[in-house]
Amino acid sequence: MYKSFSMELAGRTLTVDVGRVAKQANGAAFMHYGDTVVLSTATASEKPRDGIDFFPLSVEYEEKMYAVGKIPGGFNKREGKASEHAILTSRVIDRPMRPLFPKDYRNDVTLNNMVMSVDPECDPEVVAMLGSAIATCISDIPFDGPCAMTQIGMIDGEFIVNPTLAQKAVSDLKLTVASTREKVIMIEAGAKEIPEAKMIDAIYKAHEVNQEIIKFIDSIVAEVGKPKHAYESCAIPEELFAAIKEIVPPAEMEEAVFSDDKQTREENIRVITEKLEEAFADNEEWLAVLGEAVYQYQKKTVRKMILKDHKRPDGRAITEIRPLAAEVDIIPRVHGSAMFTRGQTQICNVTTLAPLSEAQKLDGLDEFETSKRYMHQYNFPSYSVGETKPSRGPGRREIGHGALAERALVPVLPTEEEFPYAIRTVSETFESNGSTSQASICASTMSLMAAGGPIKKPVAGISCGLVTGETDDDYLVLTDIQGLEDFFGDMDFKVAGTHDGITAIQMDIKIHGLTRQIVEEAIARTKQAREYILTEVMEKAIAEPRKTVGEFAPKIIQMMIDPQKIGEVVGQRGKTINAIIDETGVKIDITDDGAVSICGTEQAMMDQAKKYIEIIASDFTEGQILTGKVVSIKDFGAFLEFAPGKEGLVHISKLAKQRVEKVEDVVSLGDVVKVVCMGKDKMGRVSFSIKDVPADAK
């Protein structure tokens, strides 16, 4: 049965059609927001997947190029693998949805969002997230929703709900908040040093809007929602837990996980697991889920230690940061490098500078962002956690971590005019025991400064965790969580910023939301830790950006020419500019407004290229002294090349002060000589002279 529902959202109409399309999916919502159209579907397998100890949720965000009237590039002219932006959007949808599915549910679930039309006034990301929530809520898939998502921008200090793409381009804040009926469940932000109090206000402005959307979703579910289907629970039998505790008492498990060394803990758990496998050798059913049971036992033990005893696995106080270390210039010959270590987490970051033409080209649905000059990439090899796995390129997690660190530094980057470089920073994870993304922020800041990148202020990142009890008031916020506290805790609240404000937030949780009290405490705690990291660690390693780029980094000369002269500089089919490049070994980029960028490593060659371009792009003036190479000899004189494609004639009468019978008596092919421009003759031709060059000419 086809039904349509509508509400006003930020001055635009949001329409949800149910029962119109994709009727064979468990749930489908055909979403219209302005002229933005997204089809969101939710489907689940009939039976649980065997042999897994996690919920197999897959979220897809498909960018169809026809949505913006484009044909995809490439040989096949069809959409290929998901873009980086599509992957990041999928993660934003996944993070608030995942905690609301039952923890013992093992059926495969796919949430698919197909962007079919894009209205620049209405961001498809918001529509896709709302569509996923609605499709799941009205389906028969078990889900403890609804949840809603809102974006907040800020221009001139005023909050804007669901800003347009044009408003986002000039906004000081790009905030996305997802909420349940009472609590915040996901936060994602990029900001231009927004004060903590202002950020909290923005978060709860979004939360307020989300409550109206949730009422709208409730009305849809009331009319067309399906009863939730029963499912086969994959919960661990209580009898197994009781048997495990008989063999491994709580005190023994507590002793096993209480260590500041990750490998020691893992070895302790391995010994316990082997003992249990031996004890349950005759019970195949228990052996099949023993690994998950031991994991759950560890989790309960660690949570009790933290919440009841205020005792962290590595012995730190609740607000204590792990030992920190920072150093720069650890890799020779690269343009900039730094290493940041926090406990058993270690990141090496390397910066590479290149001309602006090397900026990444973006072929997506956002017509306001077609390229980016700053790229941060994050790698997580298996050796960083002591494992052996083949390297298959970056996965969604790596792309997400790289994007977070990138977003954290964008607000402090110099403008293109101040620093005309494309910048690539790569974070290599040497060791991992939690918070590698935040260590990447610290390392990339120092690496950029070491490379001579004049960032406005240093940026640091820190993560807070959470362990909750039975009530909203029974909780503990942990500063600087390690891997174990991330796995067994309820929250990973990452905040990056400068001394003056927040530049990025990413909050993931495993429970059904956070109260305002927890959000405020976590943000306050991260500010305190961030100040310490900046002042006591990073600024002692490198206090300010280097004044010049490194020895091996390319240098750049910028100049302006008359746009009308661009054709002469380029030459027919690029002949002139390629001749300059071949001779000098530099890289030259010219924009339509006449801005020229000359990039190279040898200053003399860059200066020569600049001189050539100046000669080509300007008219000769009387009295101008030039150096030219003899490229052709005629009976009446010699032709000199002053720059590729720019020639002039020295008449035989101007070769020497005495009478010259033959041109070859004075010059030969290939000679390099100085000449002076004599101005134009009666025919309007520019003439040059060797004999009239002043004696003191340089």
Each language-model region and where it sits:
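Long, basic N-terminal domains or extensions that often function
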Residues: 1-232
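Mobile "lid/hinge" segments at catalytic clefts and subdomain interfaces of large enzymes
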Residues: 140-257, 448-547
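Flexible glycine-/small-residue-rich
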Residues: 33, 42-44, 61-63, 113-117, ...
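Single-stranded RNA-binding regions, centering on S1/OB-family and related RNA-binding modules
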Residues: 552-556, 563-698
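Glycine-rich, flexible beta-strand/loop modules in the N-terminal catalytic cores of phosphate-handling
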Residues: 25-110, 115-117, 122, 188, ...
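Extended amphipathic alpha-helical scaffolds
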Residues: 1-45, 53, 230-369, 554-568, ...
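Conserved phosphate/anionic-ligand binding catalytic regions in large, soluble enzymes, centered on
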Residues: 27-29, 122-141, 328-351, 433-453, ...
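Flexible, glycine/charged-enriched surface loops at secondary-structure junctions
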Residues: 103-109, 144-146, 213-231, 263, ...
